Amino acid sequence: MNIHEYQAKEVFHKFNVPVPKGFVATSAEEVKTQVSQLKSDVFVVKAQIHAGGRGKAGGVKLAKSVEEAQQFVKDMIGMTLVTHQTGPSGQQVRKVYVEEGSSIKKEYYLSLVIDPKLSRPIFIFSSEGGMDIEEVAKNSPAKIVKFDIDPATSFDSSKLSSRFHLSPEQIEKISNIAKKIYDAFIATDASQIEINPLVETNSGDFIALDAKINFDDNALYRHPEIMELRDYDEEVKEEIEASKYGLSYIKMDGSIGCMVNGAGLAMATMDIIKYYGAEPANFLDVGGGASKETVTEAFKIILSDSNVKGILVNIFGGIMRCDIIASGIVAAAKEMSIKVPLVVRLSGTNFEEGKKILEESGLNIIAADELDEAAQKIVKEVK
């Protein structure tokens, strides 16, 4: 689960990570009524969307007066912000965050993520933070260092002193912030915390000028206070609907809808669709216990995308028996009167019985025995 920058800074504040003071506004009028709480002559106005790259896209503005801040807020509210992370359709700005300006001496990058190879959190630090961090990673990887974390000691500052020209005082201040975000990471079951930039001010203080936190969806039941931060307006409505039925769904830009059991098989299915020259419209994992109802809902979600021109169902029967899933497919197809081509590949437990159910259904369902064959058939039907 993602949250907005202003919400992430509220979390930081609880863990004593220094952040600039600010407030949320949904209109220019709110700026005038709230700006008195900020002790600054310069203000930063930031569009609040669940995507990075806002600065380069015009979603972060520096205002040198209250009137200018109001105008920026007025311009941003309701606009569609397109960044390299939003996709071409962009995201609508419904809120902005107005905060005190900071005197910036130097920008750094600091994040905490889960390393899938090590199966534990790691810190990532760079002396070149800011809007161009992606370019730094691409062109100057030596300026980025990863820290393996010993859970017993959290942050080890020795690599900072050996890789970067930092004073003992700078290392101490960065280490203190790193330890605090590690505490926040563990306490909230976060999957990622990012500060970009972490700035050193002219007075020598370090402040989290931006904040990003993602949380582990599987741990949210332990954190009702974090669930309250969820902004459904920022999420894809199909993904919200899918979560109600235990379906893992991610909308994409292609024309072939996918219904698969198992995340690995789902990714392999999308890969082979691309291999044969088409694009998947979604990732959809129905899990290991799908029923007629969940299959029906899965079809509804897939077909709610007007770009879908065909559907590939790829099921490997293990816990999920192929005859049960076949019955669910037939029932759902009859109920919904599916008009687009439907290719079904069944393999595993009771797959022969499943194929027989499909054949005797009287529906125009195209059967396939192998994934390669299934992908070629659906690509041919769509093209």
Swiss-Prot record:
EC number: 6.2.1.5
GO biological process: succinyl-CoA metabolic process; tricarboxylic acid cycle
The keyword Ligase appears for this protein: yes
Keywords assigned: ATP-binding, Ligase, Magnesium, Metal-binding, Nucleotide-binding, Tricarboxylic acid cycle
Residues the entry annotates as binding ATP: K46, G53, R54, G55, E99, S102, E107
GO molecular function, one term: ATP binding
Enzyme class, UniProt record, top EC level: ligase
Domain ATP-grasp: 9-241
Protein function: Succinyl-CoA synthetase functions in the citric acid cycle (TCA), coupling the hydrolysis of succinyl-CoA to the synthesis of either ATP or GTP and thus represents the only step of substrate-level phosphorylation in the TCA. The beta subunit provides nucleotide specificity of the enzyme and binds the substrate succinate, while the binding sites for coenzyme A and phosphate are found in the alpha subunit.
Oligomer status and interactors: Heterotetramer of two alpha and two beta subunits.
Family, per entry: Belongs to the succinate/malate CoA ligase beta subunit family.
Protein name: Succinate--CoA ligase [ADP-forming] subunit beta
Species: Wolbachia pipientis wMel
Gene name per UniProt: sucC
